[in-house]
Amino acid sequence: MVLLPSMTSLLLVFLFLYGVSPVISDGSDHRYKVGDDVPLYANKVGPFHNPSETYRYFDLPFCSSAPVKEKKEALGEVLNGDRLVSAPYKLEFLGEKNSEVACRKRLSREDVAKFRDVIAKDYYFQMYYDDLPIWGFLGKVVKEGKTDPSEYKYYLFNHLQFEIFYNKDRVIEIIVRTDQNFLVDLTEDKEVQVDFTYTVRWKETEIPFEKRMEKYSLASSMPHHLEIHWFSIINSCVTVLLLTGFLATILMRVLKNDFVKYAHDEEAVDDQEETGWKLIHGDVFRFPKHKSLLAAALGSGTQLFTLAVFIFMLALVGVFYPYNRGALFTALVVIYALTSGIAGYTAASFYCQLEGTNWVRNVILTGSLFCGPLLITFSFLNTVAIAYQATAALPFGTIVVIFLIWALVTSPLLILGGIAGKNRKSEFQAPCRTTKYPREIPPMRWYRRTLPQMAMAGFLPFSAIYIELYYIFASVWGHRIYTIYSILSIVFLILVIVTAFITVALTYFQLAAEDHEWWWRSLLCGGSTGLFIYAYCLYYYYARSDMSGFMQTSFFFGYMACICYGFFLMLGTIGFCASLLFVRHIYRSIKCE
């Protein structure tokens, strides 16, 4: 039983190392001689404003001078929607060409209509040359001041200009341009003969091979962009300082009597009448309802927090450099699988501390709490992608691989973690004895209820990260490159601190109002930032992006719902743990009968 998870874990580590560094491992061997064939791969095409809606290159009626060969791809590349095939253009090392004919094709009326439709939707293509990405638009629409789309003119770019930079025997950079002098008019519904041609120019450069990917990260590191990012951090730090001062004031108020007691040794302090949070010391550690669900949420949240920490560590050491195809998706799948034991251990140990008896059910609930909604969402969205015949639709073989990872690694580690948590012989540490009968909670003002407090708890952490959210969204759901992982790590740390502080403060106010049911409230308040992020999704979609269509809309809101749900669990766990430490601390400082 122990050997199987160990072997599968080693297999996953190998898969991870293979998946996150295909460019590094290949690039070290990419030395060419004059005339060597350097493969050019066509990846995908799609509407520029709908990044999830991409199709195979040859789904459009392009021609090819040779049989199309598919490139074998890693797991992360497939999850990223990459489908690389050999392109019709031949770019030998240091081989210059001038208006070379790649292939010829007579477009039928259906082909012309298809090209005209994609040109109207601003379709672009993406290719890779020696693992360097290049893009270009398929054509253009000439409106000439006319407002009726039936009067527009549609042109297909049939000539590409490749400008390639090299350093000794290595390819350093490639630029592709469409030539406005080579256009094919596709306005009318008639057959058209098209010659797809290209020009190749080689230029020498002093840029070393190790720095050839740096140009893709320069855009996000421009001074005016950095100023915005640093302003975001300063704004967040001010929020943290205000909250820290606010919390310090609360703690001073809470422990004021104890400071007086220890400073002046006055016995009269012990005899004063208990009020507020002291009055409910016999109920504050009464175990909550639905403790199995609470423990499962804490287990899943702990796993997701661990996953986020590892992802940031990999980002800071440079694994997720621009256009390292599929590295992030590979890392997410592998690290999530390997950290499932943390979820099982955390959930089962806490559940048993709360005197739970059905730990098997608790472990199953933990494993399905996040994966269940994710599976349902994926099944729906993958069906949509299949209906659209988009590259986002996962092949059956990839689905089998993911299922095997779940069956052979995720589930066994989850169960082993649950067994370890169950066997952890520790009782819940409660400084005060719980009374036999629960105390009645007095009526609360509207602003002390759950929903208003969730709104307050989510707004402050969200205000600390909302500036950075735009750049993240523009990178994930657009074509902007995000590489400032150090700043993102600082923002994430601030998010964690603010979430913990604001949840502790609201927990104190709840206890001061003699409301002892703080367990679920602290988790809901901590996780409410996820709801604010999802509300930002609505704003971003309608006000800051040009996304459209059923597929792109469903992918955006579907996967963002899963991401925000993950943030809810992770930040809710942080808020609960901070509140638990705070509650234990303040009740240790009083004398409990």
From Swiss-Prot:
The keyword DNA repair does not apply. A motif (Endoplasmic reticulum export signal) lies at residues 582-587. InterPro entries: EMP70, MFS_trans_sf. Residues 252-303, 348-366, 420-453, 508-522, 576-593 are cytoplasmic. It is found in: Endosome membrane; Golgi apparatus membrane. GO terms for cellular component: endosome; endosome membrane; Golgi apparatus; Golgi membrane; Golgi trans cisterna; plant-type cell wall; trans-Golgi network. Residues 1-25 form the signal peptide. A motif (Golgi retention signal) lies at residues 591-593. Belongs to the nonaspanin (TM9SF) (TC 9.A.2) family. This is Transmembrane 9 superfamily member 4. It comes from Arabidopsis thaliana.
